Amino acid sequence: MSLNFRRGVQSLLTLPFRKTLESQETFESGTKIRHYLRENGQEKSRIHLRLDPGGEGTLIVNASSVMRLNPTAAFMAWLILEGTEEKKAVKALRDRYRVPEKQAREDYSSFALHFSSLTDGACPIHELELDAVMPFSARPTAPYRMDLAITYRCNNDCAHCYNARERNFPELTTEQWFGVLDQLWDLGVPHIVFTGGEATLRNDLPALIRHAEANGQITGLNTNARRLMDMDYVKELVDAGLDHVQITVESCVPEIHDEMMRAKGAFCQTIAGVNNVLRSPLYVMTNTTMLRTNVHTIPATLDFLADLGVPTVGLNALIYSGSGLTVGTGLRESELQPILNIATQKTGQRGQRLIWYTPTQYCEFDPTANNLGVKGCTAALYSMCIESNGNVLPCQSYYHPLGNILTDSWDSIWNHKLSVQLRERQSLPAKCEGCPVVAECGGGCPLTAEGYRKENLVNLPVVH
């Protein structure tokens, strides 16, 4: 036990973290969020340590794994990340907490072991949704991820799109977006995802990525990848510092993909983009919305993506927002099980990772029972969205502005009545009262119930 224990500490300390900010003299001084980089050959880990005013901290690894830290643990994490020798770290603990040397050394070694397992085992930035150690128990003062809908313009016209804005919706200037990125960094937001609309239609996207990278933020792109068919453009995004990309592929059947996109020829351009990013250093995943239009092609689509070499595939149900409220092709939660069983089997056989995004009512579909992880609504908690005009939304499909990032205080946005209502699960269905898994389930997506009422879905069988 002690030998393995020592190996855990040693493996951590022999792969030093490179600080991307100037070294801080003390634990208390410096910025609210600190960014560290650890490189081991071609592998790279990006660690963010976010410190709260009360001394508590949050350790975020590759924007996917999260560990909430009490003040003592936050201090020990800082010691490790700063590259402090174990002997000096133990002395610092003794001086700070007035504890015996034996206790300080044991506590530090124990924490270092847990720390090492988290940082060594964290999946690179594939899971774009938060995977909290204690699901939904943490109450941060700002989200860990912010989606930036930098434009609502798009070169597709998806019939099921959750976008509820006009395509000519006002847009911030490049300089204004720079200011937003700086403000988010000061708030302690380490993960930025550029989305839309279609974010690649903004010519300043590489500049925005470069600015976020200079701050220390991890950056991702949600895209239809049509512009990524240009390899020179892909290289420009990579050189700017882009970390990961998620590409929408609705079907392996070109006619069905193009029908859902309402854009003839979109499939060929998207797949060309997929092939380009797979040849780049980017972390790559795809996402597919399961509808009655394409559900019969999902098994073949999964095989197609595996043959392309896509390492991670995401699936989600219809989002009941924007055109999704009226498209009439959504599946009931109770219909998801058979197709997700197939997806789990196929991705497992091909060595891929499967990500399921949609928060569901666990009494209708329980993702934990299907080895898909805890999925609950994280709106106004772990993730939020800023629209192209600066309005802040609970999430990118919940079109009820909480304020504007340029004109309203963050405190008023974070503590808006709707923000609190969503975080504290204050509007759950009556049947959820007393449920033992309500903390994880959260009653499912708050937009789905309204969508069911408007769509008046009937329980149709899933086509296999």
Residue map of PLM features:
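Radical SAM enzyme [4Fe-4S]-AdoMet core and its adjacent flexible, acidic
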Residues: V238-A240, T248-E250, E255-L393, S397, ...
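A broadly conserved sequence feature marking short terminus-proximal activation segments
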Residues: R105-E129, G348, I386-W414
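Long, charge-rich, low-complexity alpha-helical segments
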Residues: S2-L13, R18, S65-D147
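Cysteine-centered iron-sulfur cluster-binding motifs in ferredoxin-type domains/subunits
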Residues: I150-D157, A380, C432-A439
